[in-house]
Amino acid sequence: MAHIPSVKVLVVIQADPLKSPRAVEALRIALGLGSHNEGNDLTIILGGRAPYLLANDTSNVVDSEILEKHLPVFIEWGTAFRIAPDAEVPPQWLPDCAIKTTTIQEIADAFQSADRVLVF
């Protein structure tokens, strides 16, 4: 059986999780796209207020019960959530979540190296 190369997927989430279910839905979609290889070819960039998805207290996040089911998988995979330089960040991050601040150049590089890009 021939080896099929993995597709590099970039998911950019800018939707405000405190106002819209789109941010949690974007993470659910990212989980599905990364599930074939435990997220190894998946990059997630959070901009705007999207970093609140990774807050220690997500009680104000729309669809937080769905978020609570999916975040542990990303933590298990060791997925690094990249935080855009202009993003609003929560006062306290969720423990064990891999957080990486990123530069505009790193974001541009992620777009260039991705085979597929989804923006929410």
Residue ranges with predicted function:
Residues 1-5:
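Positively charged, low-complexity intrinsically disordered leader regions
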Residues 8, 41-43, 80:
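Residues at the starts of beta-strands that form the adenosine-phosphate
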Residues 11-26, 51-58:
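Short, glycine-rich nucleotide/cofactor-binding loops
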Residues 23-44:
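Histidine-anchored nucleotide/phosphate-binding helix
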Residues 47-52, 86-89:
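Short beta-alpha junction loops
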Residues 57-62, 97:
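Short glycine-enriched, charge-decorated loop/helix-capping segments at active-site entrances
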Residues 60-87:
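A glycine-rich helix N-cap at a beta->alpha junction
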Residues 96-120:
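Low-complexity intrinsically disordered segments
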